[in-house]
Each structure stands twice: as structure tokens, then as C-alpha cells.
Amino acid sequence: GALDLFNELKDLADFSFYHETGRLLVEVNRSKGHSNLFSEFTKNLSGKQKNEILTQYYFPFRDSVEKQISSIIEKGEKVLHFSVHTFTPKLNEEIRKTDIGLLYDPSRSEEKEFSKKFKQNLKNQNPELKIRFNYPYLGKADGFITYLRKKFTENYLGIELEVNQKFVSQNQMEYRIKNAVFLALKEVG
């Protein structure tokens, strides 16, 4: 579902990256020391095997994204990093009562303003959507965007879009959701 939505949105971007290797191997959105960097299937591998996974999948993706962002910021331009994810509708017996989450760092005023505008644009597209800020996760929690915010303190906005997987069937996001996100992002950009 997230890749399907990403493909819908990439025409709006000056550049785009996606990672097809799933988190069952390695979670590229986590910092290198995070306890959930490796999954239940890979956490017991040898150090050598883990390093091979990091070398083959983790570092190339993260380094490519970071290098592209750096080259744009060095030119004096601003980067909006819009990261697309999905979340499970039910976690540990808790029903998550939202359709879309917008994750940002509340201490960064430009991210906060962008998120407010984007949320309003989404509501204009589909008033029925339940949209929450920093849910189902905190926007400043451990993650790739959090790392990038620390590295690029100026001219970088990191926003994570979390869409409920109830809108996904056979890896395809419902068209009405894709279209609402596309139009809302186009309008705010």
C-alpha cells in the first residue's frame, strides 16, 4: 500500500527514493543502534551476517537519500522530505481510531505549519477522514527523519505520512485516499 501511494505521489517530487526490502530483514527507518533495527527473523544472525545486511541494504539507501538532500541544501534550497508509510489498524488489541497520521517535530515551526495546511487540504478533499498529528507514532521518535533533522538543522522539513492499512487491499491503496493525498500535497506545495 505505501509503495502504491508513493508511486502516485512521485510526480510531485523533484526526486524520490523508495526501499523495497521489507522490515523483516532490516528496518531502514531506524537508527543503527535501535533495538528493532533487525526483525525477529534476523536479530539472532551473526554479527558478520548483520553487517552484510547493513552494507547491502541499509547504508546504500540511507546514504543515497542523505546525499541528495545535502546537495540540494548546499545550493541554498529548501527540502521537504515527505515519507510515506502505512500502519496496522489494530495493535496489541487496541483499535487505532484514525485514518491518517501526520508526523512532525512540534518544535520545528515550519513542519508544524506545513502539517496544519496539509491536514486542512486533506479535509477539504475528504471531510470524512480522521486525521491526527503525531499519531500513531510521535514525529520526533527514533527514525531516519529524526536523524536527518539533526544533520540538516536549516532548510529541511521532515514529514511522515502514516495511512491506515484498512485502505489497502492486495498492496493497492484505495484510489480515493491516493487522490485525496495527491491533491492535498499538490495544493500545499
Where are these predicted regions, by residue range?
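N-terminal catalytic or cofactor-binding beta/alpha core of small enzyme domains
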Residues: 1-189
